[in-house]
A protein has these predicted regions:
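A well-ordered secondary-structure block
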Residues: 1-34, 58-77, 86-142
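Proline-enriched interdomain boundary motifs that mark the N-terminal boundary
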Residues: 35-41
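Solvent-exposed, conformationally flexible loop/turn segments
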Residues: 44-49
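Conserved glycine-centered beta-strand/turn positions repeated across beta-sheet architectures
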Residues: 52-54, 135, 139, 150
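Signal-transducing coiled-coil/dimerization helices and immediately adjacent hinge/linker segments
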Residues: 81-82
Length: 161
């Protein structure tokens, strides 16, 4: 598989054909299936947190962490902000890095915590915080197999009042 699909990080290949009167178009989509996320409710009402669990497809892969992003619902911009061109960025600066839990007695030097993601024999589980209130939350799971980390899965949640 590593030789047949580019970069070795893709596990599936989708092939499509587009046909018109004077043209034939071939397109390919490379997809990597690296984690199986267990079913979870993705439309949340006023929750403080929800538990996410997943299994790793490749037993040699290692969880590096999860980037956890928050984006508030868009609000109408005032005429003054529109004139100045003060448009908010797509991703706000509200993100956090959820790290694998360390063994008892070990702590991360940066903040003194043990980490947030519980490692299991074939995967992981984590309590995802919705601490910023209503909005869109996205988790990007990063794995490594010895050659650097890569995004292996993504899941988004909608939180409403």
């Amino acid at each position: 598989l590593d030789r047949s699909i580019p970069q070795g990080k893709f596990t599936h290949l989708g092939i499509g054909l587009g046909i018109s009167r004077h043209q034939l178009t071939l397109f390919m989509v490379f997809i990597g299936r690296h984690i199986h996320i267990d079913p979870v409710e993705r439309l949340i009402r006023s929750a403080k947190e929800t538990e996410l669990s997943a299994r790793l497809v490749n037993p040699q892969a290692r969880l590096e962490g999860i980037w956890w992003y928050y984006e508030p619902y868009p609000e109408p911009l005032s005429l003054q902000r529109l004139r100045v061109g003060d448009v908010p960025p797509y991703w706000s600066d509200t993100k956090s890095w959820l790290r694998p839990q360390l063994p008892l007695g070990s702590y991360y030097a940066s903040d003194g915590s043990r980490g947030e993601v519980e490692l299991k024999s074939q995967g992981f589980k984590v309590k995802l915080p919705f601490s910023h209130g209503p909005g869109l939350y996205t988790g990007v799971v990063y794995l490594s197999t010895g050659g650097g980390s890569y995004p292996a899965g993504l899941i988004s949640f909608v939180v409403r009042d």
